[in-house]
Each structure stands twice: as structure tokens, then as C-alpha cells.
Amino acid sequence: GDVYKRQVMGGSLAVNKRVFKHVQIAEKISGLRMGPDDAYLIIRGLRTLDTRLDRHEINTKKIASFLSKHKKITVLYPYNKGTKDYKMWKKYYKGSSGLMGLKIKYRNISSIDRFVNSLRLFGYGYSWGGFESLALHQKIKEQGKRKYLNLSKDEHIVRLHIGLEDPKDLIKDLKNSLKFIR
């Protein structure tokens, strides 16, 4: 159900008694505190985190391999051999995540929106580490001044988070939507 889609954030605060009184007042006014159900969901999710992260990695490697073969796409995923960040990734990391970027070359900007909007198994939005796959076309103004991207005037970024779905189904969905990239 929807219980898995909930976003939960937690933290702790270490303060002296004088400041704590102010924190209590602010907490009562705002209602910002973690309830027992939220704490339970966090604990339950942590129990399967390593298994889910392994599945994200396996699925994402398959998707990245598939997308790397497309002539109008540069996959921004350091796990892929031959990428400029692969050596650094190999030196410092043991695994990879479900997050990647696609640098897409286009003739018509609306083709990128059609690509993203035609995906059936991908939700639309920002997230990282959730169970569902997501896609998001990042507009130029959202990309900031990331000089390392070296985007030309006819390239945009689509951000993908690969979830826990069957990678064969995700590849089929991507394949059907890639026809819109012109």
C-alpha cells in the first residue's frame, strides 16, 4: 500500500535545559516530532535496506548497459567502464546506487518531454532509494552551473532512479519511449 511511499526524516537535538524549553515550545506549536508509527516504519525499512540496495545496483547496471548502446544518450553512471569517473568510483566505492543521469542529444526539446511522459513503469519526480523507478527531465535552470556536465545547446539531462521492478520490464518500457528522442 501507500505506507511504503511515505517520506520519513528523523534527527536528534542535543541542547542544554534553557534551550530545551524553547525547543519544546517550538515543537508543540509546529507539531514536528516523530511518532511511534514513523519510528516503526524506519526500523522495518532498515531491516531490508541491504537487500533492496543490492537489487537497485543489479537493476541499474542492466539499465545502464542497455541505455549506453543508444547513439543519442550518454549515460552518467560512474560504474560503467569507460566513463571519466570510473577509476575514481572503483578506487573509493564497493557498490553503486539506482541513480543515473542521461545526457540526451535532441533536435526538438519537446521530444525529451515526450520520452519521459511516455514511460509507463516510471513515476515522475525526485527521489533516491525508493522501491519505484522514477524519471525526471531536469530543465536547464534546475541544473545549475555544473560545469562538469559540458552540455551543448542541443543536450538535456534526464534523471533516472531505478527501483526494484523487473529490469526486463523497465528496459521494454524505455525501449518503447526512446522512439520519441529525435
Locate the predicted segments by residue.
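Conserved core segment of the aminotransferase class I/II
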Residues: 9-70, 114-119
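Beta-strand segments within the central parallel beta-sheet cores of soluble alpha/beta enzyme folds
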Residues: 24-28, 74-79, 158
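Short, well-ordered beta-strand elements within core beta-sheets of diverse protein domains
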Residues: 42-51, 98-106, 158-163
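Conserved small-domain helix->loop->beta segment predominantly found in fold-type I
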Residues: 61-120, 124-130, 143-149
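Short, small-residue-biased leader/transition segments that mark boundaries at the very start
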Residues: 1-4
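PLP-dependent enzyme catalytic core of the Aspartate aminotransferase-like
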Residues: 106-107, 118, 133-182
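Short, solvent-exposed loop/turn segments at the edges of secondary structure
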Residues: 6-9, 95-97
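Well-ordered beta-strand positions enriched in small/hydrophobic/aromatic, beta-favoring residues
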Residues: 11-13, 75, 100, 135
